[in-house]
Amino acid sequence: MIEVRDIRLALDGDLKAACAKKLRVPVGDVLEAALLRRSVDARRKDDVHFTVTAAVSLRRGEEKFSPYTPWTPPRVEVLKKKPALRPVVCGAGPAGLFAALTLARAGAEPILLERGSAVDERKADVEKFYQTRALDTESNIQFGEGGAGAFSDGKLNTGTHDKRGRQVLHDLVQAGAPDEILWQAKPHIGTDRLPDAVKGLREMILAHGGEVRFRTKLTDIELSGGALRAVRLAHGGAVEALEADSLILAAGHSARELFALLKERGAQLEQKAFSMGVRCEHPQEVISRAQYGAFAAHPALGAADYRLAVHLPDGRGVYTFCM
């Protein structure tokens, strides 16, 4: 197969025909065409179309073009000997879930701790709060399986150009996310699919020998000689000392008791810059019309988004996100 870039594809266009036109070959010579990346070109509101990269198989003449190198997952180093003590991961948001999955694949049998509930029970806890204003301090919008973004639309953009990010997308698809995140220029899972993908990641961790404990809160860290010896856990009314020599803290930004504990135990903490802002809401049809003009209602496009940013002379700035 060959890789073909910068293919112009009409919103209702046929991918094979578009590839043939780009390559200047008969349509019948295009045996197969698969999307690798697709973005919307809306610079001209009277000519909104897709720009596509595709993997193409030709009947003849592939040697004239750049070959397609398919993505291959990174090699997993499986431990030859299991560690004497199982690694502990604190927090079942994105960082914790993927840390636990990576350790599980390596044969380390990690223990993943989450102070909140599993995502289905958490949805019920959040809905109860909306209806009654009865707050469950351990299972809510901030705490629980999936992290603080579990009920968002699951945008997957990152400014980090790390090849391992591709593995994350493939893992999410395996966990139940839609296949199109593999080729969308701005991939997102969708609010309706994200909780199921989170459950799927948990099941993958369990299938590889990991353990997941919900409603289990890390309350203390025992150190000796500058090394970790155990973690103390609270589950319901029970307290447990779990012997451990490795701990990954993926607690997010709201577990303030944990940060206070770390400071008390002498851990080095560093301030992180944060942004303050306001929530802006627009009718979706207004944004889609502004971005896509007369094509706004086309079913191939879906909801439009936008991003605005300004950098001020004093070094500060204003920007939009998740729009």
Region spans (language model):
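Residues forming the flavin
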Residues: 3-50, 55-323
